[in-house]
């Protein structure tokens, strides 16, 4: 009983720390966006956002799936210091070489495409995120469940970035300063990562076996490419087909949704190292118990969020960004239905397949999502702008969730009781009626 309590307490602490970390990662762009919306023009905000979107493609490619794969491997090796050092060193050097390669490709792209050359300073600034990706070893700390360090480190650098933003960005001509500050917090985190890592691991140069990681990494590279296509293609196509103001409307709307989604995903992210460990130790009962509790938590938190957003999104957008971004409210309303579906798909599909070493099955789900979202965006964006992107992304996410859950179904057994589900439904029905009546009165 005592051991179980300690485990629950540990997961609770990790959840709180990781919630702070992930919400802050999204609150920082939100808060900085609030300030920027009142200082910079939608055109320049759109340019900065679009450049971030482009560099993100290269960051994901350079990572080779290591953020996901590394958590599992570090978690499995954490009881053996020698093996832990070896796994860390192998993955670090793979990421090092890959990042340098894709950094070269990124600079070739900037020099080759005229629209990028016109904003070359902006793209060079954003390219720093790719360069310092060499030192992004969050997967080490997540695999070791060192969420307190991750969270506190993030608070410090995000706070510094916000102070710099208010101090230096004063008018529309300061959009390059805005871009620099957007990168400062992230790069600072990476540098502290590598310095602090000496407490847990030593970088080895001898007797390394890179080959043993290649098969899983190649699968995850394919998965990550597909994921990034269906998660980044909306902004990319909006930037291609529409004026940059439309990009800003969509990004500001989806950003609030992503903050709420991060809250929903936090618990599932935190338990991945624990689930991986339990699965490797063949502790099926504990494995299924934690999964069941996670699904119940998703339902308890997600459904009220969806209902609340339907009645408050207009006020939220006006309060945060001002009246000129009111069209972003419709984006939040539509995408909010994913606040339950996406975390369930992530947990019962993507994470389960990774933990059980079935990475190759993940390709099926994300490839379908990438194809459907690309086609959907191509058709809908030209006619419906930001709402076309929102519709396409929502439908693609639903498709991915269904495929994920289907593929992962045989590796776990949920113990959801009918009475518990009825209570959740009834409580949310009461909330829906209350908000509807309140809205009618207003």
What is each stretch, according to the model?
Residues 1-7, 11, 148-151, 175-182, ...:
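Interhelical loop/hinge segments that connect adjacent transmembrane helices in multipass membrane
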Residues 10-68, 103, 162, 182, ...:
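Signature of the first transmembrane helix
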Residues 32-58, 175, 212-220, 238-258, ...:
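Interfacial/gating helices of multi-pass transporter permease domains
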Residues 109-126, 309-341:
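Interfacial segments at transmembrane-helix termini and the short loops linking adjacent helices
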